[in-house]
Amino acid sequence: MNEHSFVKSVHRKLDKSVYVWKIADRYSGGVPDAMYAGPAGILFVEYKYIKLPKRPTTIIKTGLSPLQEQWITQMQQWKHPTWLVIGAEKSCLILNKLKKNISTAYYLKNQTDTNTLARLITDVTQGQPNEKILTRAKPEKNLER
């Protein structure tokens, strides 16, 4: 599987009520991969697909560019829900705050599946109960190992 296939697998699982825009902007650097919208608001997601290292202490290289970091940070400062989703095989790690030095152990401890990711995207855009969990979390939530 690659990033394109991973994103496609998530999109297939989304509720039909979610508006999906797969962003492909060759002229503006740093723009995330997707925007999701619904009556409760919008959500930006930058996807990174990796081969998960075997050693638990290995730091994961996401390949996030400085422009992508800047874009995500700016949107989060303006209180727009923006996630970094790191996918590996059939699992993913959802980060609502940028985090440096993510280890394989951290990934494995905090991973979820793509069904849950699709449900959370739906919840945020449609205004369901899980919306506050990932859009208003304190920064420490994703910064501790």
What are these regions (language model features)?
Residues 107-145:
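Charged phosphate-binding loop/patch that engages nucleotide di/tri-phosphates or the phosphate backbone
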Residues 1-25:
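Acidic-basic catalytic patches of nuclease active cores, encompassing PD-(D/E)XK
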Residues 34-36, 41-53:
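Conserved catalytic cores of phosphodiester-cleaving nucleases, focusing on short active-site segments
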Residues 23, 44-47, 85:
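Short, conserved beta-strand edge motifs with alternating hydrophobic and charged residues
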Residues 73-100:
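Nucleic-acid nuclease catalytic cores
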Residues 30:
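Beta-rich catalytic cores
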Residues 13, 101-102:
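Structured catalytic cores of enzymes that bind and process phosphorylated ligands/cofactors
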Residues 51-71, 75:
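Mg2+/Mn2+-dependent nuclease catalytic core
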